[in-house]
From Swiss-Prot:
<comment type="subunit">
    <text>Interacts with its receptor PEPR1.</text>
</comment>
<feature type="compositionally biased region" description="Polar residues">
    <location>
        <begin position="37"/>
        <end position="48"/>
    </location>
</feature>
<dbReference type="GO" id="GO:0045087">
    <property type="term" value="P:innate immune response"/>
</dbReference>
<dbReference type="GO" id="GO:0009723">
    <property type="term" value="P:response to ethylene"/>
</dbReference>
<feature type="site" description="Required for ligand-receptor interaction">
    <location>
        <position position="86"/>
    </location>
</feature>
<feature type="region of interest" description="Disordered">
    <location>
        <begin position="35"/>
        <end position="92"/>
    </location>
</feature>
<dbReference type="GO" id="GO:0009753">
    <property type="term" value="P:response to jasmonic acid"/>
</dbReference>
<dbReference type="InterPro" id="IPR035176">
    <property type="entry name" value="PEP"/>
</dbReference>
<feature type="compositionally biased region" description="Basic and acidic residues">
    <location>
        <begin position="49"/>
        <end position="64"/>
    </location>
</feature>
<protein>
    <recommendedName>
        <fullName>Precursor of elicitor peptide 1</fullName>
    </recommendedName>
</protein>
<feature type="propeptide">
    <location>
        <begin position="1"/>
        <end position="69"/>
    </location>
</feature>
<comment type="function">
    <text>Elicitor of plant defense. Induces the production of plant defensin (PDF1.2) and of H(2)O(2). Promotes resistance to the root fungal pathogen P.irregulare. Triggers the expression of several PROSCOOP genes (e.g. PROSCOOP2, PROSCOOP7, PROSCOOP8, PROSCOOP12 and PROSCOOP13).</text>
</comment>
<keyword id="KW-0611">Plant defense</keyword>
<dbReference type="GO" id="GO:0009611">
    <property type="term" value="P:response to wounding"/>
</dbReference>
<comment type="similarity">
    <text>Belongs to the brassicaceae elicitor peptide family.</text>
</comment>
<dbReference type="Pfam" id="PF17232">
    <property type="entry name" value="Pep1_7"/>
</dbReference>
Length: 92
């Protein structure tokens, strides 16, 4: 009876870790960083190896050139202010 209680307690403690594991796997898959290594396919001639080599080759060939598409805007120049007629308190 004690063993069954221990097993239920131990399995209950693993639930948060399983949830965390599943969440991390989903996030890594979305980012493209998750590579699952299954123990049954340990043969050296797997189809994953050539794909990885092709990805490496394309990563080396890709270059990013940053250019600016913005046009330079010239500031508007103000003309000279008109000289007042000499009458105080009046505006043009």
């Amino acid at each position: 009876m004690e063993k069954s209680d221990r097993r239920s307690e131990e399995s209950h403690l693993w639930i948060p870790l399983q949830c965390l594991d599943q969440t991390l796997r989903a996030i890594l898959k979305c980012l493209g960083l998750f590579h699952q290594d299954s123990p049954t396919t340990s043969s050296p001639g797997t189809s994953k190896q050539p794909k990885e080599e092709k990805e490496d080759v394309t990563m080396e060939k890709e270059e990013v050139v940053v250019t600016s598409r913005a046009t330079k805007v010239k500031a508007k120049q103000r003309g000279k202010e008109k000289v007042s007629s000499g009458r105080p308190g009046q505006h043009n």
